[in-house]
Amino acid sequence: MPELPEVETSRRGIEPHLVGVTILHAIVRNGRLRWPVSEEIYRLSDVPVLSVRRRAKYLLLELPDGWIIVHLGMSGSLRILSEELPAEKHDHVDLVMSNGKVLRYTDPRRFGAWLWTKTLEDHPVLAHLGPEPLSDEFNADYLQQKCAKKKTAIKPWLMDNKLVVGVGNIYASESLFSAGIHPDRLASSLSREECEQLVKVIKLVLLRSIEQGGTTLKDFLQSDGKPGYFAQELQVYGRKGEPCRICGTPVVGTKHAQRATFYCRQCQK
């Protein structure tokens, strides 16, 4: 599933081609996504894009009278293409732009979403979200407070959007490895120093992934059709049985809450 770096990479890729440009119309080839494509999107006609933002794993396209909310789901990607390029099997939504380009949404598993809202504050998918991990609000004081009485393992807690948004399976595993913290540790067992280190490495790992265009394991593509190259830098994720890059101990691969988890039993305590 695309996580924060992949969504931010998509945002940065499409923004220069959309802001200040008019959406001539939308083409919805298959509206049966995770939720049905909102009727307002079918009716788009001659509306300018004012901004392209991101909240958590949602892309937000600001229009004069509302917002398009896009979620990439499990396998979605957005590309900027010539409007003359024919659509393929899994190309479900196009925004046809006045600059001769289209924003094309591709999603083999159709678990993404194209939604509409008049105001962001009113939409349920954006309610009750925690802070952005790259913001000043996400700091050691905040994490220590939220972990203090939490009797659950730290990895699923990091992946809870009520704690912090956008830290999915890949980046939770990678950040815990970089911080030297075992994914099974109770959140309440983390010391102040460990909270400081974990916040620091989460920010560093996410920023590094954004620099590399995100992580492509299967479906994700950047807006120019290139894969994300952070996959080449993964320390533990997807490396079950391979030697730890630090100590050489075989990387462990297990399941936590039905999600794959990877760690080094020697480096993470």
From Swiss-Prot:
Keywords: DNA damage, DNA repair, DNA-binding, Glycosidase, Hydrolase, Lyase, Metal-binding, Multifunctional enzyme, Zinc, Zinc-finger. DNA binds at residues 90, 109, 150. It catalyses: Hydrolysis of DNA containing ring-opened 7-methylguanine residues, releasing 2,6-diamino-4-hydroxy-5-(N-methyl)formamidopyrimidine; 2'-deoxyribonucleotide-(2'-deoxyribose 5'-phosphate)-2'-deoxyribonucleotide-DNA = a 3'-end 2'-deoxyribonucleotide-(2,3-dehydro-2,3-deoxyribose 5'-phosphate)-DNA + a 5'-end 5'-phospho-2'-deoxyribonucleoside-DNA + H(+). Its EC number is 3.2.2.23, 4.2.99.18. Belongs to the FPG family. Involved in base excision repair of DNA damaged by oxidation or by mutagenic agents. Acts as a DNA glycosylase that recognizes and removes damaged bases. Has a preference for oxidized purines, such as 7,8-dihydro-8-oxoguanine (8-oxoG). Has AP (apurinic/apyrimidinic) lyase activity and introduces nicks in the DNA strand. Cleaves the DNA backbone by beta-delta elimination to generate a single-strand break at the site of the removed base with both 3'- and 5'-phosphates. HAMAP family: Fapy_DNA_glycosyl (MF_00103). This is Formamidopyrimidine-DNA glycosylase. It comes from Klebsiella pneumoniae (strain 342).
